[in-house]
Curated annotation (Swiss-Prot):
It is an enzyme of class 6 (ligase). The active site is at 86 (nucleophile), 177, 179. It comes from the Bacteria. Residues 204-396 form the GMPS ATP-PPase domain. InterPro entries: Class_I_gatase-like, GATASE, GMP_synth_C, GMP_synth_GATase, GMP_synthase, GMPS_ATP_PPase_dom, NAD/GMP_synthase, Rossmann-like_a/b/a_fold. This is GMP synthase [glutamine-hydrolyzing]. It comes from Ruthia magnifica subsp. Calyptogena magnifica. Gene3D superfamilies: 3.30.300.10, 3.40.50.880, HUPs (3.40.50.620). PROSITE patterns: GATASE_TYPE_1, GMPS_ATP_PPASE. The keyword NAD does not apply. Homodimer. GO terms for molecular function: ATP binding; GMP synthase activity. Its EC number is 6.3.5.2. Pathway: Purine metabolism; GMP biosynthesis; GMP from XMP (L-Gln route): step 1/1.
Amino acid sequence: MMNNIHLDKILILDFGSQYTQLIARRVREIGVYCELFPYDVDSEFIKKLNPKGIILSGGPDTVTLDNAAKAPSIIFDLNIPILGICYGMQTMAIQLGGRATSANKHEYGFAKVRVRNHSPLLSDISDEGHGLLDVWMSHGIEVEQLPNGFKLIASTDNCNIAGFANVEKHYYGLQFHPEVTHTKQGERILERFISGICQCEKNWTTDNIIAKLVQNLKDQIGNANILLGLSGGVDSLVVAVLLQQAVGKQLTCVFVDNGLLRFNEGNEVMQIFAQNMDMKVIRANAHKKFYDALLNENEPEAKRKIIGRAFIEVFEEEAKKLDNIQFLAQGTIYPDVIESADAKYGKAKLIKSHHNVGGLPNDLQFKLVEPLKELFKDEVRKISVKLSIPPHIIYRHPFPGPGLGVRILGQVKQEYANILRQADAIFMDELHKNNLYDTVNQAFAVFLPIKSVGITGDERRYDYVIALRAVETIDFMTARWARLPYDFLDLVSNRIMNEISRISRVVYDVSGKPPATIEWE
């Protein structure tokens, strides 16, 4: 009998912390399903979701201000456990009758917390056997008075109330961040809350997820036929294998060669499927359609929507050649949904639309199938391992659905795409040659439509700029720019400027996510 992977769930209310997605990943790593919503999500929706526990994230607001973000009051009437982290702890304290104030000493970075009094959350958890925890702090406000019914459970030298609890109601607050790796016992603390206090069963496992996804696809598609928009990346490949298991020959994959692919990528994708996948794949050449559609468009959001519409038009054209195509499948994953602020997520602010979420037309002729829509990237990769997808495909760097269309800043021209393809190929070639490809999670080149002065021999040149980007990340929700060796960057830069006639300058992107996104557009 299949376990219900959604039976026990945790609701995470996001107050804007850069660590909120880490909370979600930690909960799922424990083996429990969770969903992330903005803090001001509709109260009726919360009741309908029926979570077994709620986590209030940190956030950048100053909780003592009149207009500070507050948790929906309904959560305190549901008789379920609540864990407030950092800002979440502060707003919980104020909303339940306590007080917060500016801290005498702000705490940013490592701190030592002393566990105090007995509580189901922290008892018998320590790093040094003396009730001390090495934790990560990030706050300038602190709780100064506990609400009625609460007791102190943790403190630091600079923060008297670093943790509190109302054990009877199962309400807990932590001023530190258990979700970050810097808090050594963070995973144990979260597991104590989720498994012990919320009493969630660990049904969110890779095997259970696969079984549920395949069954859902069978139920949803029935005897109809389905198209899969194939990119060659791990997300769409996982969807392809799941669909093959669910509906077999009812699946047709369409690989759109749109002129915005990496060097030789079209041939490589077709070769991957010929060698590893026993399924029908159609290659649609749509260079002209995409370039014509993008002509004279500079705005990133508009480009994404144009590309989304063009993909759908190609799928519709191919569907007319086949019988009974009622469904279109895509490899949309949870970060795509979060960043696009899908309508399901209420009042979340748009970061950027993804061509397969916010970029789809309203008059879509297919029923949309997105089996990975609830999954983070690392969860998709775990599934791909279980499905025996070859490792060189699983760990291939991600490539955005809009392709080079969002790596060429501003207007997309075929000339720009050809230059960028060459630069990106040189970057990838050297990453492989120097055994650096697998040390970063994503790397690529970006074309900047600006010209910079350079020198070739004794002659002045005035040509375009290429930016190189490489990041280290687990879930692609947060990322650290990769510290590639200077000698390596020097080698790549020289090759690009010597081998591509229209490039006079190469720069390296040293922006993390946040505040930047991984892609430039």
